[in-house]
């Protein structure tokens, strides 16, 4: 049986085949993207592609630069041809939860801006409903985070925790906190997102709804391509 890393590696050729010529790429955050970056850098070098990357986190931008990938800021580009990113969950409608790496706001900005958004996952990320195996991240202002937590818990039977890293509150690249929400089955993601995004102090949610054009899945039986 292949482990999770092996399943992710299986997907990379299908991703790389979509990169060509002169493109502006949105480069996501997470373990899958860290596996993809070295192969992407090699492809760009071997084929002489004129690729510019726009990164969703400071960590990924640093890694990309180290590998020789040309990087620019989001405000320096007018469009993104292709965004490539991982996901924490994917449901049957190709709606996803992201934000396990804490970069959900920048990921959403870049993924929404892209002409095409491709998601790369292993089969453990495929679920029947959002929140089945992964908590929904919500990026919030540090000033009133606890009051937001209480309001989220009052919406339904939801357990909310402020994310910590080695006993210290996790801080996003935007200087905010992350609240991780354990969702019960039956929560409507569209309605819940609307509730959250209108709470004062909520920066963004980890719901990426109606955004993915294609999901590439590494499975024990091989690579599966999911499209709407």
Curated annotation (Swiss-Prot):
Biological pathway: Carbohydrate degradation; pentose phosphate pathway; D-ribose 5-phosphate from D-ribulose 5-phosphate (non-oxidative stage): step 1/1
Amino acids binding substrate: 29-32, 85-88, 98-101, 125
Keyword vocabulary terms for this entry: Isomerase
GO cellular component: cytosol
Gene3D superfamilies reported in the protein's UniProt record: 3.30.70.260, 3.40.50.1360
InterPro entries for the chain: NagB/RpiA_transferase-like, Ribose5P_isomerase_typA_subgr, Ribose5P_isomerase_type_A
Listed EC numbers: 5.3.1.6
Catalyses which reaction(s): aldehydo-D-ribose 5-phosphate = D-ribulose 5-phosphate
Active site residues per record: 107
SUPFAM superfamilies found in the cross-reference section: D-ribose-5-phosphate isomerase (RpiA), lid domain, NagB/RpiA/CoA transferase-like
GO molecular function: ribose-5-phosphate isomerase activity
Enzyme class at the top of the EC tree: isomerase
GO process terms (BP): D-ribose metabolic process; pentose-phosphate shunt, non-oxidative branch
Quaternary context: Homodimer.
UniProt similarity note: Belongs to the ribose 5-phosphate isomerase family.
Job description of the protein: Catalyzes the reversible conversion of ribose-5-phosphate to ribulose 5-phosphate.
Protein name (database record): Ribose-5-phosphate isomerase A
Organism of derivation: Staphylococcus aureus (strain Mu50 / ATCC 700699)
């Amino acid at each position: 049986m292949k482990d999770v890393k092996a399943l992710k590696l299986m997907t990379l050729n299908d991703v790389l085949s979509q990169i060509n010529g002169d493109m502006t790429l949105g480069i996501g955050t997470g373990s899958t993207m860290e596996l993809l970056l070295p192969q992407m850098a090699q492809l760009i070098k071997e084929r002489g592609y004129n690729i510019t990357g726009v990164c969703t986190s400071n960590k990924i931008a640093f890694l990309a630069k180290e590998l020789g990938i040309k990087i620019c800021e989001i405000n320096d580009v007018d469009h993104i041809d292709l965004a490539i990113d991982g996901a924490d969950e994917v449901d049957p409608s190709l709606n996803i939860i992201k934000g396990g790496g804490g970069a959900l706001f920048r990921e959403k900005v870049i993924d929404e801006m892209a002409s095409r958004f491709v998601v790369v996952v292993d089969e453990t990320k495929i679920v029947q409903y959002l929140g089945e195996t992964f908590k929904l991240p919500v990026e919030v202002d540090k000033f009133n985070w606890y009051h937001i937590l209480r309001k989220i818990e009052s919406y339904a039977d939801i357990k909310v925790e402020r994310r910590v890293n080695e006993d210290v509150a996790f801080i996003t690249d935007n200087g905010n906190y992350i609240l991780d929400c354990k969702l019960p089955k039956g929560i409507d993601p569209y309605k819940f997102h609307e509730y959250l995004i209108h709470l004062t102090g909520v920066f963004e949610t980890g719901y990426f709804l109606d955004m993915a054009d294609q999901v590439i899945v590494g499975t024990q039986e091989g690579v599966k391509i999911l499209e709407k």
